[in-house]
Amino acid sequence: MDLAPSLETELIDPDEAEILASFRALPTEDDLPCDDGEPMETPRHREQMNLLIDSLKVHWADRTGYYVGGNMFVHYDPENKRRSRGPDFFLVLNVVDRERKSWVAWQEGMRFPDVIIELPSDTTRAVDKGEKKGLYEGLFRMAEYYLYDPWSQEFIGYHLHGMRYHEVERDAERKIYSTATGLYLGIREGWLRWLTVEGAVVPTPLELAEQAGQRATQAEQQAEQEKHRAEQAEQRAEQAEQLVAMYRRRFGDLGGGREQEQ
C-alpha cells in the first residue's frame, strides 16, 4: 500500500487546499449564461461592433495570445454569478488562444479586459458613463475605456492613471491613441475605426476582399491598355511598311536613284 503523500498534500497546506477546492468548485463558462439574450439596440450598433472586432482580427492575423469579443458576458464575481457585464467590445491581452462562451474572470486567473468600448444608446448612456465606468475603473482596473455613440458620433476616451480614469484629449485629427493595441481610434465616414500610426483605416475582411478585387480590376485594365498600345504600335508599323512599299512601286528604289545621279 502506497502511503506516500500526494504532491498536492506536500505543497499545499490545509487552508490553501480548502481555498483551492473552493476555487475548483466555482462555475465555469459552461455553467454560466453567455449573454442576456437581448439584441443590440440598433442594427447600426451591431455593425459598429463587428467593424471593431473584425478589423482588429485582420490586423492581428499573425498575432497570438489575445482574446477579442463583443456583446457577451464578462463574469467578474465568483460569489454571485448574476453579477456580470456585457461590453459591446472588449480586448484581453496575454491570454490563451481559444474560443470562449463568455469571459469568466476566475477561470482566467482573475484577468479582466485591457480595453472596453461601449456603444451607448438612449437607454444605456447613463449606465455606461456612470455605473460601468466606476466598475471598470475600480474593480477591473482596466487601462482603457472608450464610449462611442454610433448615431450622434459622441466619442469619449478614458485612460487609467494611478487609481483614477482621466479623460483623454483627442489630437488635431480627433483621434485617440490606444497603447494596448498600438493603434488609434478615430471617426471615419461616421464609424469608429482602428487607424494605423500612419493614419490608414484598418480594413475588415470584406474591405480587404474589395481592395483585392479593385487591384485585380486595375491590373486587368492596365494589361488591356498595354495590349491596346502594343496593337496600335503594330498597326503603325504595318502602315509605315505599306507606305514604303507604295512609294517603291510608284517611284522605284529612291535610294538607288540618288546614287545614280551622283
Place the predicted regions along the sequence by residue.
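A generic secondary-structure signal marking the coil-to-beta-strand transition
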Residues: Q48, T64-Y66, P87-D88, P113
